[in-house]
Design a protein with these regions (language model features):
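Extended amphipathic alpha-helical scaffold segments
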Residues: 148-192
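HEAT/HEAT-like alpha-solenoid repeats
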Residues: 1-8, 26, 33-50, 72-91, ...
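Extended HEAT/HEAT-like alpha-solenoid repeat tracts in very large eukaryotic scaffold/adaptor proteins
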Residues: 19-23, 62, 134-152, 169, ...
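Alpha-solenoid repeat junctions
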Residues: 27-31, 70, 100-103, 153, ...
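Eukaryotic N-terminal, low-complexity and coiled-coil-prone scaffolding/targeting segments
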Residues: 1-23, 29, 33-39, 50-58, ...
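HEAT-repeat alpha-solenoid elements in large eukaryotic scaffold proteins
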Residues: 13-27, 42, 53-59, 74, ...
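Acidic, Ser/Thr- and Gly/Pro-rich intrinsically disordered linkers and low-complexity segments
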Residues: 2-4, 114-140, 180-198, 219-228
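Intrinsically disordered, low-complexity regions enriched in proline, serine, glycine
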Residues: 17-18, 36, 59, 78, ...
Length: 246
């Protein structure tokens, strides 16, 4: 299987086309027969293929192949994607949105929600390990998961699932906001966020999640009361939490 996927990087159109057809057929019919230890390599090769082309048809093929592989091996594929590169990379954003729009969207959101919850518990239990690894590396995983979660939520068709997962999403994201307030992040990790405040990514994720669950009038009220700005400000964080709890 790996040798076939590697041939996708071939510059000869006929060879690449044949490899694409074979790969989709194999993944659709025999994807479950792929050993899990091979999945990370396949994901890496497919992602390399995606980044190397701007051709619409070829990019559609890669996204379809990732979907088929995720259908057979959801957890290994998600883990590989989360470790692939910067989550704000435009190609990675396209991958997450493609999966979010697919029939796997609900399953993927459930998995990402659980991963965010587990990441929060893990970081709380292993403060000494965090110091050894460095704050930037320790902070990377929750941010990567949250970036992926935001892309999936933004395109997910079923709002009811977001509502059902809210009891897990809300405390998980709030915990990350609380833990990151006041931290001095390394530039490589700080660049993952568009704003200056360390917790801005998680606050934006909270706003996005609640936008899929609440009526517009409640969202407008939260904005008017300054809930999001308060959450991201260390001295006003508790006020922001109280506004959400009302």
């Amino acid at each position: 299987m790996s040798s076939i996927v590697e041939s996708l990087l071939c510059t000869r159109p006929v060879c690449a086309w044949a490899a694409e057809r074979w790969t989709l057929t194999f993944l659709g019919d025999c994807g479950e027969q792929i050993f899990q230890e091979e999945v990370p390599k396949l994901v890496h090769l497919l992602y390399t293929c995606l980044r190397s082309t701007r051709q619409s048809a070829r990019r559609c093929f890669v996204l379809r192949a990732v979907f088929l592989l995720a259908h057979s091996h959801p957890q290994p594929v998600l883990d590989s994607l989360l470790q692939a590169c910067l989550p704000t990379d435009s190609d990675m954003v396209e991958v997450w949105r493609s999966l979010g729009r697919s029939v796997l969207g609900c399953q993927i959101l459930v998995c990402l929600t659980e991963k965010l919850r587990a990441a929060g518990k893990s970081s709380h239990r292993s403060e000494c390990c965090t110091r050894e690894l460095g704050s930037s590396q320790a902070a990377l995983e929750p941010r990567t998961i949250t970036h992926a979660l935001c892309e999936v939520v933004s395109v997910l068709q079923r709002k009811t699932l977001v509502q059902r997962l809210l009891p897990s999403l809300l405390p998980g994201l709030l915990r990350q906001v609380s833990e990151t307030l006041g931290e001095e992040l390394a530039p490589s990790v700080g660049d993952l966020e568009s704003a200056d405040m360390p917790g801005s990514l998680f606050v934006a994720a909270l706003e996005l999640v609640l936008a899929r669950c609440l009526d517009n009038r409640w969202l407008r009220l939260l904005r008017e009361q300054g809930a999001w700005a308060s959450l991201a400000e260390p001295r006003a964080h508790s006020t922001g939490v109280c506004l959400l709890a009302r």
